[in-house]
Design a protein with these regions (language model features):
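Bacterial Sec-dependent N-terminal signal peptides
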Residues: 1-21
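Hydrophobic core segments of beta-strands in well-ordered, beta-rich domains
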Residues: 37, 87-88, 153-173, 177, ...
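Repetitive beta-architecture junctions, highlighting loop-to-beta-strand starts
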Residues: 46, 180-182, 237, 248-250, ...
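An acidic-aromatic loop/edge-strand motif
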Residues: 97-130, 249-252, 256, 267, ...
């Protein structure tokens, strides 16, 4: 999710005011790899530049602490050992995103800022807090989060040269949204992520009149083994990233070193329009590339010579990744588009195409390489309170699985040096259900490699006075898989204090939080739900019912009947040390009062989960 509703439509009246800069020379000694930056979450915002030999290496806004930092951010200076770099700061008044200047009386841009925060900056062989990173009190242990700063949309998901790449929207210099870079992590198993340096930076020399400058917004990445682009060099088929450069348009970046660093394509921008978030993939039947990109629908012609409809996903094609032709659009969607094909489970040789947006709204239909045909009404992929957002699926997976990662929007971590997390990777399947074809996620099979201290019960009868209970470590991340045979009573599965209720009388489940979440204060420009709304799911008529849950610190993800219902939410309740299946005393069927009701637990597995993070 982004602050700018229309990425490339900038109000001419918008003026960003800067003050007199204050500069400091910092000599980077041999062995020093990080420039440590003190952060105060309540500090004043200044604009900073880090320079070498007169050229800006990065430019960002930051709340420099003048004393007693809340935490420390860092900038990698490995390449500048034995050299001097300069850091300068200046007072800064950010633009009001409605177009009016947000002048505040406490900021006077005509004077230089205090240099107290600048004087606390230092270079070292470690970043501040490195010895305790990944072991912080509230760090999720099986969900990816950055070492420092804010993260949101997953970007550029691609398998390349033996690694799964996870790029993501990242503010490396603050706990709130802003300074959009592409952060970068890699894993060989989709679990054990190694965070690397920032991969894509804002372009620093963009200064059009009235512009907010540049940010590296969301996009995707592909491999071009047929060299349709002509980008191959020295036998290397590069990683090619597509992203929205907010000051330019849709742009290409090229990497020849396994996605670690990127160079700018000289023909950028490849597309200028009122939109963002290009997802690119190869369409083999047509022997061409496809880009699905969100269009805001402002009354302006695309440079391709076609008119965009209101809030549509536009489909463009290209023979070479560089020249694009508008083909069609599907209206009613908002940002972060996806388009992919999936086989229909249980129907050999039958497949359908799925188009979805950031909110998890999707349609199933057909695609001929140029036009998407809607085959059934819009459905909602995530059924929770909006904590699942901006998901993307992997290109080029070696086993053809459709692997998805979403952003756990507004799952905040107050008091920590990081903020937000990615949701657990899932495999998507297309299933025939009571209401037609449904997109169904389940945790990737690799989760089993994290299991420890596993417990299993089978064929247990649950009655109103005899629940089935398993004790667990409430501080550990856990994975629960429970299968029930329908009885004559409603049943509750309590996972560390989070209640999941199934009412068999009406043959539907109500998955609800029972006093587990408190209202939260949004960090950045996002408004999270302040209450948890029960989720209703009509079951398919079978006598078996399955609930799967992953609980990790303040994150809980629920999968019902192998993903026929899915949702993620914030878990702020007081945790218990148990997983318990019990019969509810009210509602449901089974006759009158005084009759002992029962339910059958066919199988209930509870696994504690090993951390995905390395030990320091």
């Amino acid at each position: 999710m982004k602050v700018l509703l229309f990425t490339l439509v900038l109000c001419p009246a918008t003026v960003i005011l800067f003050g007199q800069p204050v500069s400091r020379e910092i000599k980077i000694k041999k062995g020093q790899t990080y420039l440590n930056l003190p952060i105060s979450n309540s500090g004043k915002l200044v604009r900073a530049r880090i320079k070498y030999d007169g050229t800006a290496l990065d430019q960002f806004t930051i709340k420099l602490a003048e004393a007693n930092p809340d935490y420390w951010a860092f900038f990698d200076v490995t390449a500048y050992q034995g050299k001097s770099i300069f850091m300068e700061i200046e007072n800064y008044i950010p633009p009001n995103f409605g177009g009016a200047q947000a002048v505040t009386p406490e900021v006077n841009v005509s004077v230089a800022p205090s240099r107290k925060g600048l004087d606390l900056v230092y270079a070292d062989s470690k970043f501040q807090g490195q010895d305790s990173v990944y072991r912080e009190r509230d760090r999720p242990q099986v969900h990816f989060s950055s070492r420092r700063g804010w993260i949101n949309d997953p970007n550029g998901l691609v398998y390349y040269n033996g690694e799964y790449h996870l790029y993501y929207q990242h503010n490396p210099y603050g706990w709130e949204w802003g300074n959009m870079h592409w952060g970068h992590a890699v894993a060989k198993d989709l679990l054990h992520w190694e965070e690397l340096k920032e991969a894509i930076f804002p372009v620093l020399d963009i200064k059009p009149e009235g512009s907010r400058g540049d940010a590296a917004f969301s996009g995707s990445a592909v491999v071009d083994p047929m060299n349709t682009s002509g980008f191959r060099k020295n036998g290397i088929d590069p990683l090619v990233a597509f992203y929205t450069s907010t000051g330019r348009g849709e742009c290409i970046k090229i990497s020849y070193d396994n996605g670690r660093t990127f160079i700018d394509y000289t023909g950028n921008p490849i597309l200028k329009h009122n939109g963002r978030d290009p997802k690119v993939f190869w369409y083999a039947p047509g022997n061409h590339w496809v880009m699905v990109v969100w269009d805001s629908g402002m009354p302006k012609k695309m440079s391709l010579g076609q008119e965009a409809s209101l809030r549509q996903h536009s489909i463009c094609t290209s023979p070479d990744l560089k020249t694009w032709t508008y083909q069609s659009g599907v209206g009613g969607f908002f940002e972060c588009p996806e388009l992919f094909e999936l086989p229909v489970e249980g129907q050999p040789g039958v497949s359908k195409w799925i188009m979805y947006d950031a909110h998890g709204r999707y349609v199933v239909g057909g695609f001929d390489g140029k036009q998407f045909t809607v085959g059934q009404p819009l459905k909602k992929y995530d059924n929770g309170g909006g904590y699942f957002y901006a998901s993307q699926t992997y290109n080029n997976t070696p086993d053809n699985r459709r692997i998805q990662i979403g952003w756990g929007r507004n799952i905040t971590h107050p008091g920590m040096p990081f903020n937000q997390a990615m949701l657990f990777p899932t495999e998507l399947k297309l299933k025939n259900t009571f209401d037609g074809l449904r997109l169904c996620p389940t945790p990737i099979k690799e989760i089993s490699t994290l299991h420890k201290n596993s417990q299993t019960v089978e064929d247990k009868v649950v009655t109103s006075d005899a629940p089935v209970t398993l004790a667990v470590n409430k501080e550990s991340a856990i994975h629960v898989v429970a299968e029930f045979e329908r009885g004559d009573a409603p049943i509750t599965l309590n996972v560390l204090g989070y209640e999941l209720n199934y009412d068999n009388e009406w043959e539907f489940s109500t998955v609800a939080a029972a006093g587990t979440a408190a209202p939260i204060t949004p960090a950045g420009p996002f408004t999270p739900p302040t209450t948890l709304v029960p989720v209703t799911y009509v079951k398919s008529g079978t006598d078996m019912f399955k609930i799967e849950a992953i609980v990790d610190k303040n994150i809980i993800e629920i999968y019902v009947n192998d993903g026929e219902l899915y949702y993620a939410t914030l878990f702020n309740g007081k945790k218990t040390g148990k997983v318990e299946a019990s019969v509810r005393t009210g509602g449901g069927g089974g006759g009158g009062r005084g009759i002992k009701r029962k339910y059958i637990v066919k199988k209930m597995e509870v696994h504690e989960l090993k951390s995905i993070w390395p030990e320091n």
